[in-house]
Amino acid sequence: MAESIFRKLRDGGEEGELAPALTIEETVASPFGLDVSGYLLTNLSSSILAGKSSSQGLVLITFSRSPSFYLQLLKQKGIVVSSSSKWIRILDCYTDPLGWIDQSSTSFSEGSSLIKLHKCVSDLKKLFSSIIEAGRELVGTGKTRFCVAIDSVNELLRHSAMPLVSGLLTDLRSHAQISSVFWSLNTDLHQEKVTNALEYISTMKANLEPLCPSSDGQRNALENLFSVHQDFGKGRFHVRFKLRKGRVRVMSEEYHVDQSGINFSPISSVDTVIAATKSLLPKVQFNLQLSEKERVEKEKVVLPFEHQDDGKSNEIYDGRRSLVDGKIETTPLSSMELQTDVVSSGKGGEIIYFRDSDDEHPDSDEDPDDDLDI
């Protein structure tokens, strides 16, 4: 499904539509959002160089890692970035996000002409202008488009309020020259309303789920320690696509992180059934299954709506005195006679039902209180 995300970002949106946006959600248990960002970054770079992308340039905004890290990543994948490259620009928000370092003392070695130092990341209007300016250096001011990659919005949310950050991302999607946008987010660092706001802006959401979830509290912590360590770089990669007319498509696959990077593979059928079964069970701390003894005791309980006649034959009164002392009463009694008999017998408070007709079955679904006579 990572390939489907890449194709969406590569192809971009239709003319007049907002640019596709992707949120990559990671957690402390599965902190591989930057690996997914690196996977998309290298694939988009390859497609731009091959002329197979709707965009002709890429603007990378770095918050969590230095620009040299991404230059080295591209180099490892066989993508050489030189000072004469006309397809990529890097906006460095990692080196001096608060503007405390003297610019004269800051130097870049490899690809320094491609890297622009951006200070004071809390000024989002200035950041937006810097992104557009960097993109236009690549594609000009016409209809040619470029894509925008933000390695992490965690640091951006640290310096700016959520409404301002969502406004920046919305403005990027709305710009006519931006073909696609993607960013990563650690959901454990933010409130649920922040995550929901970013998901609302996005047209795609990808979240990483660990193969061995962490145990609650200290229970079974030692038992799961070895399996957690062994399967730390493995897990599930779930993707949700927002389609037209409010439809949603959800897809999943497995991921594995090694020294070469992150790799994706389809989920086996057995694992799919097990995962689907586990997902249907609520996340509770008590056992929902009954033991054999509990099941036997449960069957002994007589519920109020069940017959409690200890094996005797069940007789339903149909309003005509069906059985009295083993003799069948053939002549129906009038309502006045029945009321007289009840009063004379000294019994009060009995409920007597009269059937509307002989065609009505005793177990009819009609409300018997319609003919109630006390």
Curated annotation (Swiss-Prot):
One of its GO terms (biological process) is tRNA wobble uridine modification. The gene is ELP5. This is Elongator complex protein 5. Belongs to the ELP5 family. Component of the elongator complex which consists of ELP1/ELO2, ELP2, ELP3/ELO3, ELP4/ELO1, ELP5, and ELP6. Coiled coil: none annotated. Pfam families: Elong_Iki1. Keywords: Cytoplasm, Nucleus, tRNA processing. Pathway: tRNA modification; 5-methoxycarbonylmethyl-2-thiouridine-tRNA biosynthesis. It comes from Arabidopsis thaliana (Mouse-ear cress).
